[in-house]
Amino acid sequence: MAQMTMVQAINDALKTELKNDQDVLIFGEDVGVNGGVFRVTEGLQKEFGEDRVFDTPLAESGIGGLAMGLAVEGFRPVMEVQFLGFVFEVFDAIAGQIARTRFRSGGTKTAPVTIRGPFGGGVHTPELHADNLEGILAQSPGLKVVIPSGPYDAKGLLISSIRSNDPVVYLEHMKLYRSFREEVPEEEYTIDIGKANVKKEGNDISIITYGAMVQESMKAAEELEKDGYSVEVIDLRTVQPIDVDTIVASVEKTGRAVVVQEAQRQAGVGAAVVAELSERAILSLEAPIGRVAAADTIYPFTQAENVWLPNKNDIIEKAKETLEF
C-alpha cells in the first residue's frame, strides 16, 4: 500500500495497463512531453515511448476519430479531452460513432475506448473548462460513465475502464486531483463498473451522491450525527449505469433520501436517481426526496463559482428539512 493523491493513482493505473497490454495507447493534447495540463500522464512517454504515449494537434474531433479507428483495429485507446467543456467538439465521434460500434456492427466489432476528461468546480477555471456534463454523456446509449471520488477508486475504476470491451467515459474531478491522499494498493486491482459504494452506513437518511460531492456529503453526515441523526452515504461511482439495487435497498432501510450533485439540477444524474427511487421505493419513503444541485445556469468562471457550487451546508439544510418532514 502507498499513500497517493488522485493524480498519482491515475498515473499508476495508466502505467499498469501500459505494462500489461501492448495494445494500450494514450494520447491527447499535451499528454506526452508535458505529461498533461495536470501532470496526470507525467513520465509515461519517457518510460513507454512516443509510439504509445503521444501528443495530438489541438483538434478534439481528430482525437476522437483517431480513437475510433484504432479501437476497431484492435487497440485499446485512452484518449484525453483536455477539459470536459471541450467535449462538444468531439461529441459526434464519441456518442455518434464510438458508442454505437457494437450496435452498428451487429456485435462483430467493439470500441474499447477510454475517454478521460477533467471537470468540476473548486479550482477557479475559465468558463467552459469545469462544466459538469456527465448527464449529457450518460444519456448517450452505448457509453458507460464513471466518476471516482478519491485515489483508491480512481485506480481501480480506471483499470476496469481500460479493460472494458465497450467505451467508458472516465471523469476526473479537478478539485480532487491533489486535495487528499488515500491508501492505494501498489499492485493492480479493479472495481466493478456499475456498482455503488456504501461509504458510510446509517439508519435515518440516505445521502446519494458522486464525485467531489462525496467529500461534502461525508462532512455533512459528520455534522448531522452530532445532532443525533444516523446518516448513510452512498457513492454511486458509476452514473451510467446507476446501481439502482444499492440505492433502493438503502432507502428501503432509512425511509428518507437526499440526492446530491454538483451539476445543474435539471435533466441530470440526480433526476435519474430520483426517478428510480420514485418507481421502486415509493412505499418506503416517509418524506419527499430532497435534492441538492447547482443552479440551472451556465457554469460561472473563477471566483463566481463560490456562490454557485453546492456545499456541505446546503446538504445539511436539505437533510434536516427531509428528516423533520
Swiss-Prot record:
**Superkingdom assignment:** Bacteria
Gene3D superfamilies noted in UniProt? 3.40.50.920, 3.40.50.970
Annotated residues for binding of thiamine diphosphate: 60
The protein's required cofactor(s) are namely:
thiamine diphosphate
Sorted alphabetically, the keyword list is: Oxidoreductase, Pyruvate, Thiamine pyrophosphate
Q: Does the keyword Oxidoreductase apply?
A: yes
Write the Enzyme Commission number(s) for this entry: 1.2.4.1
Alphabetical list of InterPro entries matching this protein = THDP-binding (IPR029061), Transketo_C/PFOR_II (IPR009014), Transketolase-like_Pyr-bd (IPR005475), Transketolase_C (IPR033248)
GO molecular-function term, one example from the UniProt record: pyruvate dehydrogenase (acetyl-transferring) activity
Recorded hits in PANTHER family, A to Z, give: PYRUVATE DEHYDROGENASE E1 COMPONENT BETA SUBUNIT, PYRUVATE DEHYDROGENASE E1 COMPONENT SUBUNIT BETA
What's the protein called, per UniProt? Pyruvate dehydrogenase E1 component subunit beta
Q: Which gene encodes it?
A: pdhB
